[in-house]
Regions:
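Short, Lys/Arg-rich flexible segments
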Residues: 1-153
Length: 153
């Protein structure tokens, strides 16, 4: 995947030099928004960038929860909203990611690190669930967006 991304980068660099800074910024924002939509759809489908499903949550002991058991909810329901998943695009780069406290939580899941579920709780190793990453469709989306901008230009 890294070689595909590097090949796309070298191919796009030559074409981007033809655009003015304002046009590059506009293109970066639009591609960034499309990438965010793609990441949101993938999180909603509970899939890693390689197409595998997220590892499900660990089973909890629900004794004593008489009548208060909530149905299973999808993971990262709020995290995938636009208020947490931010896009930044300028003439030289596109960034799709998280900020603040949500970034720390997302990092733990992205790399499968240890963290505390709540204050005072023991450290727990979380399963790796890649929230952000490039799929082949994302690379095609970038390529198509760049070509569309150049044909309009």
């Amino acid at each position: 995947m890294a070689s595909n991304l590097e090949a796309l980068e070298t191919w796009a660099a030559v074409l981007l030099d033809r655009l003015a800074l304002v046009e590059r910024s506009k293109l970066a924002r639009s591609i960034g928004q499309e990438l965010r939509r793609s990441q949101q759809k993938r999180m909603m489908a509970q899939e890693n960038p390689d197409g595998t499903k997220f590892v499900p949550r660990k089973q909890r002991n629900l004794r004593g929860k008489m009548g208060r058991i909530r149905r299973k909810l999808a993971m990262f329901r709020k995290v995938r909203t636009a208020s947490y998943l931010k896009v930044r695009g300028d003439s030289s780069s596109i960034t799709v990611g998280f900020t603040g406290r949500i970034a720390l939580i997302a990092r733990v899941h992205q790399f499968g690190l240890k963290d505390r579920a709540e204050r005072g709780a023991p450290d727990v190793r979380y399963e790796q669930r890649e929230l952000l990453g490039f799929t082949d469709a994302d690379l095609d989306l970038i390529r198509d967006g760049l070509l569309a901008q150049l044909t309009d230009h």
